[in-house]
Amino acid sequence: MPRSLKKGPFIEGKLEKRILDMNSREEKKVVKTWARSSMISPDFVGHTVAVHNGKTHVPVYISENMVGHKLGEFAPTRTYRGHAGGKAEKGGSAPKRK
């Protein structure tokens, strides 16, 4: 269920303050954050935010089409290493029927 319009989007105060300070000084630094639930606002465009995925910080460059999404959407928390090799990779499966 989406957030109420009455409340407005959630953006962590510390993160928003750091981005606005960098905009006023025209700086481009990587900003580390653990706030995966923060919504991306238009002020963030052009900055790189390092979002924590539970193990490391994943650098995410913010572009215009990311506005309105949450930071956590761009830093996956799970790694997929593929299914077990088994017989399928070795070619040991039964021949196809016609």
Swiss-Prot record:
GO cellular component: a single term: small ribosomal subunit
Pfam hit, one: Ribosomal_S19
UniProt region (Disordered), positions on chain: 77-98
Highest taxon listed in the record's lineage: Bacteria
GO BP, one annotated term: ribosomal small subunit assembly
InterPro entries in alphabetical order: Ribosomal_uS19, Ribosomal_uS19_bac-type, Ribosomal_uS19_CS, Ribosomal_uS19_SF
GO MF assignments: rRNA binding; structural constituent of ribosome
Keywords, sorted A to Z: Ribonucleoprotein, Ribosomal protein, RNA-binding, rRNA-binding
Function noted in UniProt: Protein S19 forms a complex with S13 that binds strongly to the 16S ribosomal RNA.
NCBIfam families: rpsS_bact (TIGR01050)
Recorded family membership: Belongs to the universal ribosomal protein uS19 family.
Protein name as catalogued: Small ribosomal subunit protein uS19
Organism: Prosthecochloris aestuarii (strain DSM 271 / SK 413)
Gene name per UniProt: rpsS
